[in-house]
Amino acid sequence: MRRKMMMRGALACALAACGAAGAQVLAPWTPVKATADAVETWGRAYAFASNALPTRIVSQGRDLLAAPIRVVCAGADGADHVWTKAGSWVQAATDEAADVCGHLAVPDVFVNATTRIEYDGMAKVALAVTPGKGSSRMRNLSKVWLEIPLRPEAATLFCYSPCSWAKLENVGAVKGPMAWPFRCSVWLGNEDVGLCWFCESDERLAAADPNRVVEVIPGAAETVLRVHLADGALTRPTTWTFGLQATPTKPFDRRLMTGQTVHAPPMGAGIPGLGVKRPEVWWTCQRALPQGNAGKVLAEAARGGVKTVVFHEDWIPIQNNPSPRPDFKGLVDACHRLGLKVLVYLGYELSPLDPMWGACEADCLAHDARGNPVSYWDREPAQRDYRVCYNNRFADIWLARAKKAYVELGLDGFYLDGTVMPRACANAAHGCGWTDAAGRRHVTYPIFAVREMMRALYAFVDARGGRIDAHQSGYVCPATLAFAHSYWDGEQLAVSGGARDIKAELDLASFRAEFMGRNHGLACEFLAYQKPGWQYEDALAISLLHGVMTRPCGFANVPPFTPIWKAYADFGTADAAWRPYWAKEAVACDAAHVKVSAYEKPDGALWVVSNVSPTDAATARLALPLGCRAARDAKTGEALPVAGGSLTLALEPFRYRLVRLWKE
């Protein structure tokens, strides 16, 4: 069963590593470079130095590891084995991937590891523990742990998946020891770099405490990510398959920093507490253009600075089936005449209205651990949509449909709602899930299958100059997210019920860990649904501070963003140096809750000044750069008084100012 689940992703990876027809190094990555026991990819390097697993991982010139990655095995007496033999070598290498083989040994136990490192830096590891010399039976082994010792300065932030949307607990600062049940993806890093461990299944993980499968243990010399592979004696040879990937995965595309994207419908329709009624009828782009006055609305959007329009699910009558009504092509053409690019919605569901439903519902839908299909969405025309799993033949059907629509409609990209997320699935018909000794089913996460589907879509779209925009709230695993150009994150903060205080919950460290993009390798836009206590101005106060634009939902919400986009474009933030508030050389400010991030050029700067306190107003005095001669509010043009080498601003709670500075 497990072997069948891995087949799609494993076969594609093997073909790529062998240089099979169709394999290629996609832009902006560079070919793999391999030496005797080290592998380099764009911006990163993995060295093995006679060890089964990496002894050194470097990202952007920075060492991530404090010591070699460890396989910790204990003997029957509880004492850790001290490996007496070790070695590694590069077995094979092409431009697309390299295979590294490594081993550790004591007389009673052998550890063998094969690591395939692909051009985007994804390292897929098969780690096997077998009987040692002279015996075919496991003996003298009472535990197996994987320990990844990271430099403390390279592991100040964390994020993991899957997560609950009820409370923002899966991201933040590493402040002390943490322990969790199985997580399919765990990233540790800082504002610039990081390392992700990911795994599709907990089938072979035998932790004594199911709530401590994964641990993070900070220390003065190293911060350890520990995975409990086995907390008891192994009775037979065992192999664990997992992945490692250093981030960022690719060069940060500064062109996408300024946003100027509008999500065409007023998002949040039908979500309790947001006060937006879901439509009860269907026509093409009903929520985006309820009056049908497309020409006027699109022209106003273009004048307001919009560069890209994203049409949500109602561009098509059948969910996740990119076969629109004939009138949609005219809408795409109208956008193009105004210089607007068009992205369209695709997602993660299969509808009973889809002509492929009868042929696919049994073996292509995602099932929960009880064997039930999963659905929490319905829409017009009347249909209940079910979560699909892409670890099966439907991935090929979906890809073919997407490519056909892209070409026929002249699209500029896709907005992928959850597609990049390997969703939990236990459908045995296509190999997902596993059954324990008591007969209970468990879900698995098809990371490698989704990765190969995303790689194929990225190759197609990127070759045509298009954009893949991934919506993935709560999920930042680079194995799949690398094959997107941007991501839209934040829905988990907006949809949960109750009196949720988002401004208090979303601390700065959490934003830097998940929502910033730079440390993961692609631009992020922040998602905010307006509701009492959480408006666009609130979202902008924290997002702009981190170099992230909040995306407006609905054409009616474009006007407040127009002066922001104009200020960024006029200054040229895409080619300016960026000095964030956490940098050692950050702009000096005398108010504790006021932070300043700066875009800088030789002749001046654009400051984002934010009061991040949810409750307290602040008056802040800011130290001006040497030679500053004038300051203005970049949104309104208002002149701001400069005196004594400083600027004083008053800010209400969770509000910001954009300040343009000029030098002599």
What are these regions (language model features)?
Residues 393-477:
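Active-site and adjacent substrate-binding regions of carbohydrate-active enzymes
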Residues 40, 46-60, 65-76, 83-86, ...:
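Carbohydrate-recognition beta-sandwich/jelly-roll modules
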Residues 290, 328, 332-333, 342-409, ...:
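Active-site-adjacent "subsite" loops/lids of carbohydrate-active enzymes
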Residues 316-346, 442:
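Aromatic-lined substrate-binding rim segments of carbohydrate-active enzymes
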Residues 310, 315-324, 355-393, 422-451:
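Aromatic- and acidic-residue-enriched carbohydrate-binding clefts of CAZyme catalytic domains
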Residues 446, 451-626, 632-635:
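Active-site-proximal substrate-binding groove within the catalytic cores of carbohydrate-active enzymes
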Residues 239, 643-664:
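C-terminal beta-strand-rich structural cap/linker in extracellular carbohydrate-active enzymes
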